[in-house]
UniProtKB/Swiss-Prot annotation:
Cited function: Increases the formation of ribosomal termination complexes and stimulates activities of RF-1 and RF-2. It binds guanine nucleotides and has strong preference for UGA stop codons. It may interact directly with the ribosome. The stimulation of RF-1 and RF-2 is significantly reduced by GTP and GDP, but not by GMP.
Pfam families according to UniProt: EF-G_D2, GTP_EFTU, RF3_C
Top-level division of the source organism's lineage: Bacteria
Record-linked InterPro entries: EF-G-like_DII, EFG_III/V, G_TR_CS, P-loop_NTPase, PrfC, RF3_C, RF3_dom_3_sf, RF3_GTP-bd
PROSITE patterns assigned to the protein according to its UniProt record, in alphabetical order: G_TR_1, G_TR_2
Gene transcribed to yield this protein: prfC
Protein name: Peptide chain release factor 3
Length: 514
């Protein structure tokens, strides 16, 4: 198969949702269809000791939430599918947002009883910003939920995206009978031995069933007043195809996967800092690091840089340019994933995600190129932390482990590090409280370094250029610090303190990140 054909086979997407909407369960079912797992281990198995395949870190298994993004790959129906399962917990939005920079489409899982929730809305905004296609799976039809028409209306009103139902539920909860598949023009049956039936058989199968009569009315209404189906509008991110189903009972998931692969895009090009778009079909290899994860295997204190291949082909042992440092690196020890299990890979192409073993060479956002190509891809977004804690080692004899742990976890992007300009004290910044808990848990479990953490509360963070900085600007209402790149930054105690500073120093420019 030619390189072009290989690249065109790739489908790379992320699954996004609010916590508990069933995202990890649907990931399991997709892997099951891809033949990667023999049984779909649902997340509910906390007591039985069967954990979801994609939740691999110790703390995730204890809590039943995904706190890092897993990468999984399988072959299905002539396509090579790369799934990135992102953390649904709102405190992990940083890792999730960066992961969304490495995919060509998103699958949004919505709980039919709860509709669009806060975290889904936040993640959708990042996806919308990139103009990538969004496919919606409305989950948990095996339980009672909200009216399908109401859910579609909410998608359009809350997220501002037009929707088109690919199928429609016949009943819900105990009265759930199956799906009226508009796209494939058939019925998918929840009960009985037969999985499918023709639409013509519907009236006979569901004689006197009030839910089926309602479905026919709803569909008539949608055909008259709903949005038109448009493949181009889907690819442009302006129309979301909506699928109903139940991941827990594995109903409607395969139909979703088949249809998703029919319409999901091939690998996209990516923009460079100069505004050029690198074509995925270009023969020269290029890629960018969107995530760094330490200690994926606690037995080997390792670090892996996750790279999205943007163009060309990776071959084991190839030399690459690291544009940020101007130095070369050799990609000899490279892996692909199935959550915690991984295998060495000899080649991969545009659209694939590879893991490069890292001894401290790489940073999140790094561009890798070959030959004379020395461009850089557009930077990944940085997120401004909202809450802070002072941190120090509990045992001064463990300084070395403490510094190693902090350095690795900060490079991973799990937490942000700041140093007090005057005292040199370490301060950690996070988007949410859970990031601190995971940091503490991992420092103790993976680096054997107990830490003392003192809450500093919420702060308003702004960066300042070295040229504008005068240390006398520091006052009781702000803390002057340096970020991990040694850039000066002010941590203001609140918005009032920020406004007071801006009034006092009107010529000074303060910068805010995303």
């Amino acid at each position: 198969m030619s390189l072009t054909e290989e690249i065109k086979k790739r489908r790379t997407f992320a699954i996004i949702s609010h916590p508990d909407a069933g995202k990890t369960t649907i990931t399991e079912q997709l892997l099951y269809f891809g033949g990667e797992i023999r049984e779909a281990g649902t997340v509910k198995g906390k007591k039985s000791g069967t954990f979801a395949k994609s939740d691999w870190m110790d703390i995730e298994k204890q809590r039943g939430i995904s706190v890092t993004s897993s990468v999984m790959q399988f072959d299905y129906a002539g396509k090579r599918v790369n799934i990135l399962d992102t953390p649904g917990h709102e405190d992990f939005s940083e890792d999730t947002y960066r992961t969304l920079m490495a995919v060509d489409a998103a699958v949004m899982v919505v709980d039919s009883a709860k509709g669009i929730e806060a975290q889904t809305k936040k993640l959708f905004e990042v996806v919308k910003h990139r103009n990538i296609p969004v496919f919606t799976f409305i989950n948990k039809l095996d339980r009672d939920g909200r009216e399908p028409l109401e859910l579609l209306e909410e998608l359009e009103e809350v997220l501002g995206i037009a929707s088109y139902p690919m199928n429609w539920p016949i009943g819900m909860g105990r009265a759930f009978e199956g799906l009226y598949d508009l796209h494939n023009k058939r019925l998918e049956l929840y009960k009985g031995d037969e999985r499918f039936a023709s639409i013509e058989d519907g009236d006979q199968l569901f004689t006197n069933n009030p839910f089926y009569e309602q479905v026919k009315e709803d569909i008539e209404l949608l055909q008259e007043a709903g949005n038109d189906f448009s493949e181009q509008a889907i690819l442009d991110g302006d129309l979301t195809p909506v699928f109903f189903g139940s991941a827990l009972t594995n109903f409607g998931v395969q139909t979703f996967l088949d249809t998703f692969l029919e319409f999901a895009p091939e690998p996209h090009g990516h923009k460079t800092t100069e505004g050029n778009v690198v074509d995925p079909l270009a023969k020269d290899f290029s890629g960018f690091v969107f995530k760094i994860q330490a200690n994926m295997d606690p037995k080997h204190r390792d670090r892996i840089a996750f790279v999205r291949i943007v163009s060309g082909e990776f071959e084991r042992g190839m030399g690459v340019n690291l544009t940020r440092t101007g130095k070369g690196a050799k990609l000899s020890n490279v892996t692909q994933f199935m959550a915690e299990s991984r295998e060495n890979v000899t080649n991969a192409v545009a659209g694939d995600i590879i893991g490069v073993y890292d001894t401290g060479t790489y940073q999140v956002g790094d561009t890798l190129t070959v030959g004379k190509n020395k461009f850089e891809f557009e930077p990944l977004p940085t997120f401004t932390p909202e809450i802070f804690m002072k941190v120090s080692p509990k045992n001064v004899m463990k300084q070395k482990s403490f510094h190693k742990g902090i350095e690795q976890l900060v490079q991973e992007g799990a937490i942000q590090l700041y140093k007090n300009y005057q005292t040199g004290e370490y301060m950690l910044g996070a988007v949410g409280q859970l990031q601190f808990e995971v940091f503490k848990h991992r420092m103790e479990g993976e680096y054997n370094a107990e830490v003392v953490m003192t809450p500093m509360g919420k702060k308003t963070v702004r960066w300042i250029s070295e040229d504008d900085l005068d240390q006398r600007m520091s006052s009781s209402r702000n803390i002057l610090a340096k970020d991990r790149f040694d850039q000066p930054v002010f941590l203001f105690e609140n918005d009032f303190a920020l406004r007071w500073f801006a009034d006092k120093y009107p010529d000074v420019t303060l910068e805010e990140k995303m």
